[in-house]
Amino acid sequence: MTKRLQARRLDGIDQNLWVEFGKLTKEYDVVNLGQGFPDFSPPDFATQAFQQATSGNFMLNQYTRAFGYPPLTNVLASFFGKLLGQEMDPLTNVLVTVGAYGALFTRFQALVDEGDEVIIMEPAFDCYEPMTMMAGGCPVFVTLKPSPAPKGKLGASNDWQLDPAELASKFTPRTKILVLNTPNNPLGKVFSRMELELVANLCQQHDVVCISDEVYQWLVYDGHQHVSIASLPGMWDRTLTIGSAGKSFSATGWKVGWVMGPDNIMKHLRTVHQNSIFHCPTQAQAAVAQCFEREQQHFGQPSSYFLQLPQAMELNRDHMIRSLQSVGLKLWISQGSYFLIADISDFKSKMPDLPGAEDEPYDRRFAKWMIKNMGLVGIPVSTFFSRPHQKDFDHYIRFCFVKDKATLQAMDERLRKWKELQP
C-alpha cells in the first residue's frame, strides 16, 4: 500500500526492549532473571480456587458484569476500603481490568487529552511514557537520583530521592496527571509517608489526578511499610489506585487487575472499558475473589499469604545479593517489589568496548554480553529512563529475585563460572 498504515500515535514507541530480549533468551541457554514473574507455583489455595472456577459452576464460562464479577468487586471494596479508610461501593468505586496493564491503559485513555502533561517519576515502568503518548499527552519527567552509599556498605533503594524543588517546578497549568509507583519498578524503592505527603500536597495545590501503581504493595521488606497515597487526607477524591492479582498471588498469567477510586473519575474509565475490553475472563475473576475471601480471613496472621510471600522473598533477595557480589557487582538493597538493581560501573571502566550500536546505552550492551557469554538475563535500567537521561543512567542492571530455589541455584552455578573467568 502507498498510504501510511500506522497511526501517528505509534510514532516513536514501536521499538520494544522486551521483544528483543525475549528473542535472545530463546537463542541462548540462560537463567532468566530479567522478566518479573515467579517461576514457582501460586499458593495451593489459589490453584484450587482456579480449578474450582473452571470445573464448578458452568455459568462461570459465560459473561459476567462488564465492570467486574460481583463477588470480586464486593471483596475488593471490603478489603481495600478498610485499608484506605473509605466506604467503597463495589459498583462505582472498583473496576476489574485485564491485569494492571489494562487498568493503566484505560486510565490514560479516559483522562489524557491532546497536549495534557503527565508527570512521571523516573526510573519508571516503561509503559507509562508510551501510554501517555498514545493518548496524545506529553510526558514530563522527574528523575530520582541516588545518594552515595556509605563507604564499605551497600546502597539502599530508598537512597534514590526526589528533589522537592524539581518536582514542584514540573507542575504547570497543563499538568493533568502525576504517576506514582510504589514500591517502585525497577528500583525497589518504597516511598516514605513524608515523600507521599509532598506529592499529595502538590497534586492538591495544582488540581492534579494521581495515578498510583501499587501492584507490589504486599512485597515490602526489612520492616518497611507500604502507604497508599489515597489514604492520605484529601487524596481519595483525586487518586486512582491500581492493583494486581498476579503480583498479589504469584499468578501473573491470570491477568486480573483492578482500579479503585471516586465515582466521578471512575465513570470515565468505565466508558473506555465498555468500548474496548468490555469484559474480563469470568473464571479468573472468580478464582481471585476466592483468594481475597481467604486472605481477608487470615490477614495480619502468620497464615496470611501477604505475610508469607514477602518473608520468603526477602530471603531470596539476600541470597541474590550475596551471589551477585561474588563477581564484583555492587548492589542496591531492594526494599520492595520483585527487583533489585546492580551497579556495573566497574565493568564499564574495565570493559568499555562491548559490541553494540554507537548510540546504544552501555547497560544494554552489557546485558546482551551477559546473555551471550554468561547465560544470565538481566534488564538494562536505562530502558526505564526517558531518552535524554538514558546515557546518564547506563550503568545499572535490574534482576528479578522472585524465583524458585532451583533458579537461584542455577544462577549461582553461572556466577561461579563467571568468577573463574575473572583475572
From Swiss-Prot:
The modification N6-succinyllysine is found at K82. It comes from the Eukaryota. Pathway: Amino-acid degradation; L-kynurenine degradation; kynurenate from L-kynurenine: step 1/2. Catalyzes the irreversible transamination of the L-tryptophan metabolite L-kynurenine to form kynurenic acid (KA), an intermediate in the tryptophan catabolic pathway which is also a broad spectrum antagonist of the three ionotropic excitatory amino acid receptors among others. Metabolizes the cysteine conjugates of certain halogenated alkenes and alkanes to form reactive metabolites. Catalyzes the beta-elimination of S-conjugates and Se-conjugates of L-(seleno)cysteine, resulting in the cleavage of the C-S or C-Se bond. The keyword Transferase applies. GO terms for molecular function: cysteine-S-conjugate beta-lyase activity; glutamine-phenylpyruvate transaminase activity; kynurenine-oxoglutarate transaminase activity; protein homodimerization activity; pyridoxal phosphate binding. Keywords: Aminotransferase, Cytoplasm, Lyase, Mitochondrion, Pyridoxal phosphate, Transferase, Transit peptide. This is Kynurenine--oxoglutarate transaminase 1. The gene is Kyat1. InterPro entries: Aminotransferase_I/II_large, Kynurenine-oxoglutarate_AT, PyrdxlP-dep_Trfase, PyrdxlP-dep_Trfase_major, PyrdxlP-dep_Trfase_small. It comes from Rattus norvegicus. Its cofactor is pyridoxal 5'-phosphate. SUPFAM superfamilies: PLP-dependent transferases. Detected in kidney. It holds the Pfam family Aminotran_1_2.
